């Protein structure tokens, strides 16, 4: 299997992004828990199923699914970040989950040895392909007839956790400019925001019974505002802006101070943080 290069995504996730996510895995799991629970609710998981996860990251959702499908089923997670793959493998070993494995593989350009998957899913893992139609076609080649596919992506509105930090950061650093991608959204956190666009490319890639919708989530951080301030550096457009602009520590401190002031309203009486979020959800079948 071959295809267009996805080298830029590989470089990002094998640089600071992958390292940062690995180091902050527990906090980010808390941060994204509601989104993951909503996605898992779209999957008809049962014992014995074979599951493929795209962009499996630190392995959190793969581990949840492995427990559900049991010893007669299995989960294979794909990622391109060596740092996150190493962490995921350590975690499944520590949890004695022998039915979960992880592959260093880009499904846009490479074939997986295994096939015949009953389910394919991705928790914010589909939107980093430079050629998403090709990637989706290659995924379909690994699925059984009638396999369920469900995944999510960030919506372009309704997410104060990244719209507020991005607006503030851009006042100091200038706008986040996206590189051209032949008229399609550039790979990144918002690439699969547009429901019409994503349902169209799913149809082009050969899927059936395609549905797309927006879903409200709650983004929570039980450790409080300062922990959230730390996490937002690694999730969403502000992380991209920081990588591109390389602000010095003094500028980062000013940005953080302004963000903190606006985020204070989301602090709960128990000291935790809860704020609304919005995701784009998708599901379809492999014909």
What is the role of each PLM region?
Residues 2-49, 60-64, 87:
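Conserved class I S-adenosyl-L-methionine
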Residues 50-110, 134:
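Class I SAM-dependent methyltransferase SAM/SAH-binding core
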Residues 118-133, 155:
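A short SAM/SAH-binding and catalytic strip from SAM-dependent methyltransferases
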Residues 208, 278-287:
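Core SAM-dependent methyltransferase catalytic element
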Residues 2-6, 10, 17-24, 210-269:
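C-terminal helical/coil "lid" or tail adjacent to the Rossmann-like core of SAM-dependent
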Residues 108-119:
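A short acidic, Gly/Pro-enriched loop at the edge of an enzyme's catalytic core
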Residues 70, 129-130, 143-145:
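Helix-to-beta-strand junctions that scaffold the AdoMet/dcAdoMet cofactor pocket
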Residues 133, 148-223:
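Conserved catalytic/acceptor-binding region of the Class I
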């Amino acid at each position: 299997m071959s295809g267009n290069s996805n080298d830029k995504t590989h470089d990002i996730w094998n640089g600071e992004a992958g390292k940062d996510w690995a180091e902050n895995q527990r906090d980010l799991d808390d941060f994204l828990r509601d989104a993951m629970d909503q996605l898992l609710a779209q999957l008809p998981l049962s014992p014995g199923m074979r599951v493929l996860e795209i962009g499996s990251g630190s392995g959190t959702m793969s581990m949840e699914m492995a427990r559900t499908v049991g010893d007669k089923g299995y989960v294979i997670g794909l990622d391109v970040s060596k740092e996150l793959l190493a962490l995921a493998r350590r975690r499944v070993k520590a949890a004695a989950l022998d039915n979960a494995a992880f592959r260093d593989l880009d499904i846009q350009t490479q074939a997986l040895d295994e096939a015949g998957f009953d389910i394919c899913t991705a928790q914010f893992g589909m939107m980093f392909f430079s050629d998403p139609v090709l990637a989706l076609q290659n995924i379909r080649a690994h699925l059984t007839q009638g396999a369920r596919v469900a995944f999510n992506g960030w919506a372009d509105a309704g997410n104060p956790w990244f719209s507020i930090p991005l607006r503030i950061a851009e006042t100091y650093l200038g706008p986040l400019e996206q590189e051209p991608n032949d008229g399609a959204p550039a790979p990144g956190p918002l690439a699969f925001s547009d429901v019409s666009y994503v349902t169209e490319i799913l149809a082009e890639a050969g899927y059936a019974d395609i549905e797309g919708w927006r879903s409200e989530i709650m983004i929570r951080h039980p450790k409080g505002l300062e922990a959230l301030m730390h996490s937002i550096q690694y999730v969403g457009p502000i992380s991209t802006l920081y990588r591109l602009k390389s602000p010095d520590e003094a500028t980062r401190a000013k940005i953080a101070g302004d963000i903190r002031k606006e985020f204070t309203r989301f602090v709960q009486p128990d000291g935790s943080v809860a704020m609304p979020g919005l995701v784009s959800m998708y599901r379809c079948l492999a014909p």
